[in-house]
Amino acid sequence: MQANFLKEMLANIRGINSLTILNQKQFLSSVEHTLAKLVETNKVIYISMTKSAEDVFAMTDQKNNLFVIDVFSRETTFTNGVKPNTIYISNPANLTSIQIAIDKAIKKFPDAIILFDSLGVLSVYSDEKLFQKFIYLFSNKMNLLGGSILFFATKGSMNDEILSTVKQFCDKTYDFSELYIASVELAH
């Protein structure tokens, strides 16, 4: 699928916290396209709620530019037991563990772009107020550090109040969820 609609978001990612809202049909290919483009020239810390670390690493040839925090599989999925630039989180509801893992990854990749692949999935595991506080504190911390965060959310995957709160903490929101995607429509 062509992801031309992501060009603006990719061009303006440095130094800001941004939220990209997609529809379900766009989600997978858009996240994969974004990761592939970002790791070409940037270090990326990828917080995965939807894929194993092994699957995330398989999406790119630029493995040295990628650090994965795997909240999806909760334990190693690498067949050879090697865990390159990977931290596993055993409980997705433990937002403190996720923050500690991000802090460790930032020590290794200080100027990395941080990519959350699915805020909707993360919000399911957490109390609403704790989730909002986590996003607020994390966004503020990254602003102070001059960091870059890209949150992905699927339209309808989280309640409107939480989504509205996340939007408030982001410098830029891209809502591509209503776009007509010709290649997807033709495939059906």
What function would you assign to each model-found segment?
Residues 1-59, 188:
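Glycine-rich P-loop/Walker A and Walker A-like loops and their local beta1-loop-alpha1 context
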Residues 19, 113-116, 150:
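Structural motif
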Residues 25-28, 52-53, 75, 120-128, ...:
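Short acidic, S/G/P-rich loop/turn micro-motifs used as interaction or catalytic elements
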Residues 32, 107, 131, 161-162:
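Glycan-processing catalytic domains of CAZymes
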Residues 42-97:
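Domain-start "cap" segments at the beginnings of catalytic or binding domains
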Residues 77-137:
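Phosphate-binding/switch loop-helix module in NTP-utilizing enzymes
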Residues 131-157:
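Substrate-engagement module of ASCE P-loop NTPases
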Residues 147, 154-188:
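Phosphate-binding/switch region of NTP-binding enzymes
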